Amino acid sequence: MAFIEAKDYRFFYPDEVEPAVFVEQMEIKQGTITLLVGPSGCGKTTLLRKLAGETGIRGREEGSLTNQAKGCAYVWQNPDNQIVTDRVSYEIVFGLENIGMEQQQMKRRLAEVISSFGLENLVMRDTMTLSGGEKQLLNIASGLAMNPELMILDEPTSQLDPVAARRIYDLIRQINEEFGVTIVIAEQRLEDLVAFVDEVLCM
């Protein structure tokens, strides 16, 4: 069985006749990077939210959608929407505190993430002073700190300049190669991204 699989999957919002999401067939293998491409309004974000197991989406489903991942990190399109604390170091450990990680283990995990992402110069910074690229870097680092098997990124570079966007995609490939995390990315465009991914799925 594929790590993530959909067959004739449809999702309908309440009182809607046409599906917000339709996927005839999708198979995503564990440890790969998959790019979902499609225009605005085609259902990419709704599909990602369903893959992430979000329970707050009301609606009706048809067909099958299965996800074998244990743990999922979700990175939003707008870097500011995800940051909830005022210090970079606090942001990284926020999720670890929520799952009740022991203090010493949390310190070790923080040190590992800082080293892996090269955050030594940012760790004591106020999150409000970070650039858009630095904020998205922090969001990805915070998600990976939770040791997820799956990372979902919803247009993670849409609000970044080309240099910052390239750095984020280099980082995504590095994460995949070093940690084996399965990564699903949604974008509106295909240009310049083919080299970063293993498979492209069009919606």
Locate the predicted segments by residue.
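Conserved ABC ATPase "signature" region
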Residues: 104-122
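Conserved ABC ATPase signature
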Residues: 126-130, 134
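Conserved catalytic motifs of ABC-family nucleotide-binding domains
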Residues: 147
